[in-house]
Amino acid sequence: MKLYNTLDKKVVPIKPLKKGKLTIYNCGPTVYFRMHIGNIRAYVNWDILHRALIYTGYKVERIMNLTDVGHMSKDEDFGEDKIELQALKEGKDPISIANYYISTVLEDFAKLNILSPKGNPVDPNMPLEKLEEEGWTRATGYVDEMIAMVKKMEENGYTYETTQAVYFDVTKIDNYNIFTNQSLEEKQEGVREEVGVDPEKKHPADFVLWMKRVGKYKDHTMHWNSPWGDGFPGWHIECSAMSTSVLGEYFDIHTGGIDHLPLHHPNERAQNIGTFGHPSVKYWLHNDFLTGVEDSKLSKSAGTGASLPEVLSLGFDPMDIRYLFASVNYRVQLRFTKESLDGARNARVSLISKLRNIYRESNQKEGEILEDYKRQFIKELENNLNVSGTLAVISGLLKSKEKPEDILTTIYDFDKVLDLNLREETERKDMDIPEDILKLANERVEARKAKDFELADKKREQIESRGYRMIDTEDGFTLEKI
């Protein structure tokens, strides 16, 4: 397997710390709102990575955090705690807010076939006390570990204390901005507006490890006792504490978005060096953003985010979204529009239509996996998770002269990685389309040929009123039950 390591700024061979096993930490959601579709892209990407690693022979130990305290607005030390702010808006306590939005994470993961970090299908009704068993770590469950890390950094000379907080001194770290190669002088220019919030702060890039319950935070609802007084952890220490507590002071892969490159991930790396005397992460992977109509990043804080239920309300299937995300490499910016979703839906429906035809030809016999095609499939996966290349392998296989049952068995095997429900959709028993629906569909085709678009629209409406959806494909059309 070769993946793009942001530290090396190139695609490199993955060499596990322990032979045959990879340890992975996924930066997970801050649970103060329903994830927007830009967040979800990342989790689909890393789900496919997890599946690909298992498919190619690795054992995987993976965890994902759930940030339920200390993540400030605009990612600044002295912003508003996002969860406390949402609790105030909704008139609830912060834990109730976190619990509710964790339940929506489970719902969205289940709909999109995103496995739990442990590699199991997600039960959307899972009791939240079972989260840890499935590989999710809640920040509030690791406060003791965070305090222990801050104490160790303090002993090692990487921190200083003010009347408001305990800070990490970034000048003690060589190559602090290793991800962006930005100098501390440039960093100082970039954060100058924050100077003066704490007059005792030594450098604008220094960041909070522990915030005291004083000043604007004197009434902070979530707080714990510590050697530095009553308070709560900074955002960055949470990920360092959770990842190393579970995976150890060395682990293989850390994932996140490119928005983590300027601040969060340099701070995590600095904390690990300050605690252990060395970096903890061998490979850093970062996904790019989704863009919308104006090419602006889909961001909830900008008011342009769309949740999964909102997208599905437009008539799309969850697998249309999964297919779209799989069709573009995780490191490439992806335009998320109705047009791109329409294209993904048409491609997915066309694929299933072809598989159904092959299924009928196979006489429902089980076949054998075609090893030559499997080697091609794995080659694409190992090329920096080139999932679009695996879709091309499937396309080539569909055009081949191989036995129908072998084609199906091989593609079903590939779907262990893609998980587009290909077997279920291909072998559905309710896909016998009534003759009157087929007649309406063919009449719509003829109306379109005659450029009678008003009649064509009328026929489509009649089809949909009967509970079916007609989708145009390169081979003509397909019908599916709504």
Place the predicted regions along the sequence by residue.
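Alpha-helical recognition segments enriched in aromatics with Gly/Pro capping
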Residues: 1-32, 47, 112, 117-123, ...
